[in-house]
């Protein structure tokens, strides 16, 4: 992902290990390692614009055997997606703090409501 405009950060981590934070700004390049969980956060006052380059086309759907399968399926059901209510509380705390530091409101509250 190439950041074209805006400021924020990405969280990246392999299953069962510590979350690592990487701050970004225009010109930054973010490349999550294969098989790692990752999230991207706009914590600034301006919209973020980015160019996401990825595998997953018809030609490269199974590059390195990882594919995109189950990216939208909950990890509890064998997928690769961590639902908001199941994420590490540190993720939400970090975003709340980043928004407060930038003087912006966290607009994600409605998505954190338990289903």
Predicted regions and their residues:
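Short, conserved beta-strand element in jelly-roll/cupin
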Residues: 1-14, 57
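Short acidic-glycine-tyrosine-enriched beta hairpin
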Residues: 2, 14-34
């Amino acid at each position: 992902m190439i950041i074209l405009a805006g400021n924020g950060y990405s969280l990246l981590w392999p299953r069962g290990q510590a979350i690592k934070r990487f701050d970004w700004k225009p010109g930054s390049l973010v490349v999550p390692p294969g098989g790692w969980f990752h999230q991207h956060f706009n914590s600034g006052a301006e919209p973020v614009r980015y160019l996401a380059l990825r595998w997953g086309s018809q030609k490269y759907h199974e590059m390195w055997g990882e594919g995109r399968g189950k990216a939208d399926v909950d990890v509890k059901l064998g997928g690769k997606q961590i639902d908001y209510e199941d994420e590490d509380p540190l993720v939400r705390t970090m975003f709340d703090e980043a928004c407060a530091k930038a003087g912006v409101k966290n607009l994600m509250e409605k998505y954190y409501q338990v289903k």
